[in-house]
């Protein structure tokens, strides 16, 4: 039982005994005692002044005396104005540590068959280019969010919608057809997504050259864009694709398959995956159908040019296009189609979309539309909106080929981690295979942690060099501390020390040890908070705080050299439980922790 729960129950009993009043649990407010005061937990007594009919200090004094006499968890108390600071007994902290120790997955709540089903969409790549730094933030946030939502007792389905059709895909296809000379991933030794991305860049270069030529002949930019033969060919290819032209469809399938093989490799390296992948080419027709259904029911209206719109002025928004006059769909139509397929596949209770903040308006509209069309989760859909990510050099663009590819970034992170680890002697005495594995764990851990520690809503600059520092709020610092604890546990085992299932009470704990148990115990509340706020950064920053506190403890106290055997065993057990919570916390973020370094 949590210490707070015990104290709340005792305070309720005390108020009844002292003042003859029953109070609800929510009226009893406990918080961590501020660092400048003595104690662990503080009770705010102001809500009880009416019933005590006394001043705040006297009321606090009376409640404190009652708790000291009747609640074994309270060892001492002091009163500062209307605040009652409670010092918790050492035996109670050891009891709490035993509870944590007995649960291998402390702080995580298992789902049952009847738990709510939450679907989380993330990644959403286009099949005309490789994944880039923006996708890295999206994938890492989506994967961590899925883990956190699952750790709060929900069933989770991780899903991806692949944008595999449209004019941007036709640009890569046309460029390959015109300039590719039959190149394949096999013939070039390139990953398929990178090869197709090269042709997207190639289209853009040829198109720009064409525009420059037409403008030299006296055309305006708009006229040149309308007259561009290359763009006309791309549009014709899209029309043929929509009409199911066998040659265009065969080229589309071949190039998309190259891209999927490349994506799979990137996802595998990144450590993310999906339970179900949807493709826009399968969903856009479903969306059209649903829009026509809404038109018949009078939810939507048609303009003279045949386009279909929805009027959202009553909801404080404007008119929104759902189908163009020529019958082609827009993103909104496709999202409606995808929702229809998903709802047919799964009994969704909640849908979370992990999409950048430039789409905030889109999801406001989508929520209203899905609700109008009868999707039960429409109104409550969650747009997990996140900010842009940049490198210190500035923004990224993919049309000009100056984008930061996810593959290159991950490779650079692993090689930098290897160099840094070697310089600091972290790889000494390891085989080549072990050293490579640690470089991978540290490099990817640095990347993931640096991105996930930032509040998702904020724009951020990813600094590769800063992220691989073994000191400060970084992945490698946390990983190194975990490896350090594993080394302590190995040495303890080698010297024949066995951690008992129950650590016996009877030892006096220092303030630092009590604080560390309190921090480890907080993990359960942190996981809950991260789930309620949809915030991986809460887990990341808590894990850093825990590791920072443990490192101070490690420097200030003897563990293996402690002479008192009972204290030594307690400190080893405390270390093991810190390591467990670090492993669980980093696991929720999708980050591995090495057992040696």
Swiss-Prot record:
Enzyme class (EC, first level): ligase
Residues spanning the membrane: none
Gene Ontology biological-process entries: arginyl-tRNA aminoacylation
PROSITE patterns referenced in this protein's UniProt entry, alphabetically: AA_TRNA_LIGASE_I (PS00178)
Motif ('HIGH' region): 125-135
Localisation per UniProt entry: Cytoplasm
NCBIfam families: argS
Xref: HAMAP family: Arg_tRNA_synth
Record protein name field: Arginine--tRNA ligase
Organism of provenance: Bacteroides thetaiotaomicron (strain ATCC 29148 / DSM 2079 / JCM 5827 / CCUG 10774 / NCTC 10582 / VPI-5482 / E50)
